[in-house]
Amino acid sequence: MEVLESGEQGVLQWDRKLSELSEPGDGEALMYHTHFSELLDEFSQNVLGQLLNDPFLSEKSVSMEVEPSPTSPAPLIQAEHSYSLCEEPRAQSPFTHITTSDSFNDDEVESEKWYLSTDFPSTSIKTEPVTDEPPPGLVPSVTLTITAISTPLEKEEPPLEMNTGVDSSCQTIIPKIKLEPHEVDQFLNFSPKEAPVDHLHLPPTPPSSHGSDSEGSLSPNPRLHPFSLPQTHSPSRAAPRAPSALSSSPLLTAPHKLQGSGPLVLTEEEKRTLIAEGYPIPTKLPLSKSEEKALKKIRRKIKNKISAQESRRKKKEYMDSLEKKVESCSTENLELRKKVEVLENTNRTLLQQLQKLQTLVMGKVSRTCKLAGTQTGTCLMVVVLCFAVAFGSFFQGYGPYPSATKMALPSQHSLQEPYTASVVRSRNLLIYEEHSPPEESSSPGSAGELGGWDRGSSLLRVSGLESRPDVDLPHFIISNETSLEKSVLLELQQHLVSAKLEGNETLKVVELDRRVNTTF
C-alpha cells in the first residue's frame, strides 16, 4: 500500500481498504486523547522536520518487503500499541527500519503504513486546523493489531477481527496504554536471544539502514528488530560476526538497564554522542518517545562506529599478516637463491673434475689395451711355435724325412742283415767278371783269392739270393756311419769300379773289396 501526500497541507490519504475498515464516528470512542496527545506534544516541529527530511532514510522501502518466518512465535502485541507495528510511508522516518521481521505478515505491514499516514497529520495538529483526522485513523490501527494476535498468518480475517476491536470497551484498553513506557523500554532492551542476531548485521549496516533510529520501531516485540537488515542487504556476512561484541561493549548501556523505571545511567560514549547530535540526555525511566528515538539513533551510530573500528582492526591485522608473509617469503626466496648459486658453483666444479678424470682414465685404458694387444700377440706366436716344434718332432718318424734320416734308417736295417749282404756286392763284382773273364796272368795269390770268391758266389746261389746289377751300386749305401772313412771308401769304390771296368782293372777292384770287408 502506498501513502500519498498532498502538496502543501501535508494531508495524508490512505488506501481504500484501510479507510473502509471503520467509520469516523466509531473511532472517536476508541481514541485516547489524553495520553497520546501528551506523547505528541513532546515533539517539536524542528525535530519532526529533521526526521522527515533526513536524506539517508529513503532507502528502506525495499527492506520492508521481507516475508515472515513461520517458525518465529506470534508477537505479544497489545491492542493499544498499534503504533509500534507501523511502517514508514516511503522512508520518512528513521525509526521505521526495524519494523519488519520473520513473523510479519502482509496485514501487519498494511497496518504500519496506515498508522504512519495518520501519525504525521496528528503532529500537524499544532499548526494546522486539521484535527479531526487522527481519531478515525486510530480505529483501524487498533483492529489490525488485534488481528495480529488472533491470526497472524491469514489475510482474509482482518475485517472480522476488526469489528470485535471496534466493539471492545475503552476501559480495557486504557490501562494497557499507560504501560507504553514499559513496552518501549522492552524494545530498547534486547533480550539475550535477540542480541546475537542484532550484532550479526552491525558491521555491514550503513547508518541509514539500521533499525534503531526509526519511528516505527516502537513495538514491544524484540523479534522485529534484528532481521530487518540482513535479509535484504548482506545475509551472507551476518554469520561470522561476534554475537557478544556489542552487548558486552562498555560504549553502550546494558539492555536490562533500559527497562522499568528509575534513574537512567548512560555511558560516556552515549552521552557524548547525544550532546554532539544536539539531543537532551535522559536521566530517568521510563523514556519518552523523543528520548527513545534519540537514544536509538545514537546507539545505532555507536554500533556503526564500533563495527567500523572492528572492521578496520581486522583489516589492519589481515594486512599486517600479509606483510609478514611477504617478508618471510622474500627472505626465504633470497636464501633459496643463494643456495641455488652455491649448488651451481659446486656442480660446475664437479663437472670439471669429472672431465679430467675421464681424460685420465681414457689415456690409461688405451695404453693398457695396446700393451695387452702386443703381449697377447707375442704369447700367441710363442704358443704356435711350441706347437709347431712339438708336432714336428712327433711326426718325424711318420712323415717325410731329411737326407740324414733317410741314410740312417737303411743303415739300421742293414746292420740286422748278415755279413753276406756286403759280400753280395763284392760277389756281384765277381759275377760281372764272368761276362768278361780276367786275364790269367795274375799271380797265384790272386788266383787263390779268386777261388775264395768263387766259393762265396756259389753259396749265394745256393741260398737263393739273386745278384743285383752294377747299376744299383751308386744307390747302395753302407750302413756304418760311425766313421767318415767308410763313406769315402764307398764313393771311391764306385768311381773306381766304373773306371776299371772300362780299362779292365778288375784286380784292383777286388783288392778294394777286400779292404772294405776287412774293415767290417
From Swiss-Prot:
It comes from Homo sapiens. Keywords: Activator, Chromosomal rearrangement, Developmental protein, DNA-binding, Endoplasmic reticulum, Glycoprotein, Isopeptide bond, Membrane, Nucleus, Phosphoprotein, Proto-oncogene, Signal-anchor, Transcription, Transcription regulation, Transmembrane, Transmembrane helix, Ubl conjugation, Unfolded protein response. There is a cross-link at residue 178 (Glycyl lysine isopeptide (Lys-Gly) (interchain with G-Cter in SUMO2)). The modification Phosphoserine is found at residues 93, 191. Induction: Up-regulated by ER stress at the transcript and protein levels, the increase at the protein level is much higher than at the transcript level. This induction is accompanied by increased proteolytic cleavage that releases the N-terminal transcription factor domain. GO terms for cellular component: chromatin; endoplasmic reticulum; endoplasmic reticulum membrane; nucleoplasm; nucleus. This is Cyclic AMP-responsive element-binding protein 3-like protein 2. It holds the Pfam family bZIP_1. It comes from the Eukaryota. GO terms for biological process: cartilage development; chondrocyte differentiation; endoplasmic reticulum to Golgi vesicle-mediated transport; positive regulation of DNA-templated transcription; regulation of transcription by RNA polymerase II; response to endoplasmic reticulum stress; response to unfolded protein. It is found in: Endoplasmic reticulum membrane. Residues 401-520 are lumenal. Binds DNA as a dimer. Residues 208-220, 234-255 have a biased composition (Low complexity). Widely expressed with highest levels in placenta, lung, spleen and intestine, and lowest levels in heart, brain, skeletal muscle, thymus, colon and leukocytes. In fetal tissues, the weakest expression is detected in brain and heart.
